[in-house]
Amino acid sequence: MNPQLNNLTLPIYMDYQATTPIDPRVMEAMLPYFTTKFGNPHSRSHSFGWEAENAVEEARSMVAKLIGADTKEIIFTSGATESNNLAIKGIAKFYSNKKNHIITVVSEHKCVLDACRHLEQEGIKITYLPIKPNGIIDLETLKNAITDQTMLVSVMVVNNEIGVVQPLKEIGQICREKGVFFHSDIAQGFGKIPIDVNAFNIDLASISGHKIYGPKGIGALYVRKKPRVRVTPLINGGGQERGIRSGTLPTPLIVGLGMAAEIAYSEMEKDTKHINYLFDRFLNNIHKRISKVYLNGDKNQRYKGNLNLSFAGVEGESMILAIKDLAVSSGSACTSASLEPSYVLRSMGIGEELAHTAIRFGIGRFTTEQEVDYAVNLICSKIDKLRELSPLWEMMQEGIDLKKIKWAVH
């Protein structure tokens, strides 16, 4: 049982980039498909199958509507990791007899970088674009990186660690002018910021259910039909999903993703207003009470549900232990098991000592003002205590440049 504190349930969930709680309306929509409406959507000879197929197609149109796509352009997958792999490897396999170059960004999600590294071993050339200190790519650098051998550019819309929003419209325009396919991992932006695949000239986009208050284990890949984009499937089988992704579709999960997309479509403005208000309240109150706290990533070009802060003079891991009443992360959930400083922060040029102190606070649909205020009070009291104990903080107060210190390795 979670402890209660003035109607506040502890611990407070602030890791919305890692996953989101399922919206009760999503759960309600899914339940019948676990119990009475259990048909296989590919069974065409009876009403159980037809009922499931109708539910799947309705969900497909809800997902498509959220990004301005055609229903036929949505392929259901097990999540964004599979979608990213299918997009990048699928394009590489299909077009590698014509072209052999892919461009991505150093701060992409691990699964995009790993898919690219896998292709490098197969002889595909990969360019990893740098990012500016604000976390955004330079468009001229992208333009100059494209050659006549480039088949694909892959740039995520919202970074999972620092929340910055890349200029997708401009990137899409460059790709279209140069005749290069444009893939975007939109898992952290889908349903949270307006994304239009046609206005942005996106050819492939990866989607995740559990980042938008839907179930885990379901996602989608948008694949453009006009002009047609071809991908070689990773999974062979019964030819479901236009032959791109075989396997029996999980109707309850798809219904959940569809419902989550429908809610996001109708409530995006309300969610954005709520999240922006809490972001500003959190950041302003922290800055009023503590010195040397830095927001990582561009303040304006960002999704405000992500608040990545570095606290000078405090070790990130000890900070997380000190604020154990807040469920937060010191990086991507997929890589935070390793205590290495975040590769995203390092690629922004942030020094090791500040990268090590970074903590990501996530704000979402169900975060309350009371939770934010509790979090701020807790952080401020713990920071003061930790800084009193920190030799690094003492050295900083004395004006010693930590970058010039030679650390001994034991």
Swiss-Prot record:
Q: Which reaction does it catalyse?
A: (sulfur carrier)-H + L-cysteine = (sulfur carrier)-SH + L-alanine
- Give the Pfam families listed for this entry: Aminotran_5
Q: Which terms in the Gene Ontology molecular function aspect does this entry carry?
A: 2 iron, 2 sulfur cluster binding; cysteine desulfurase activity; metal ion binding; pyridoxal phosphate binding
Query: In the Enzyme Commission scheme, what number(s) does this protein have?
Result: 2.8.1.7
Q: Where are the N6-(pyridoxal phosphate)lysine modifications?
A: K211
**Active site, renumbered:** C334
Q: In which pathway does it act?
A: Cofactor biosynthesis; iron-sulfur cluster biosynthesis
**Keywords linked to the UniProt accession:** 2Fe-2S, Cytoplasm, Iron, Iron-sulfur, Metal-binding, Pyridoxal phosphate, Transferase
According to its UniProt record, which cofactors does this protein need? pyridoxal 5'-phosphate
What is an annotated GO biological process for this record, any one? [2Fe-2S] cluster assembly
Q: Which top-rank group of organisms is this from?
A: Bacteria
Q: Which residues form a coiled coil?
A: none
* NCBIfam families according to UniProt: IscS, PRK02948.1, PRK14012.1
* Quaternary structure note: Homodimer. Forms a heterotetramer with IscU, interacts with other sulfur acceptors.
State the family named in the UniProt similarity comment for this chain: Belongs to the class-V pyridoxal-phosphate-dependent aminotransferase family. NifS/IscS subfamily.
| Entry protein name | Cysteine desulfurase IscS
Q: Which organism is it from?
A: Rickettsia africae (strain ESF-5)
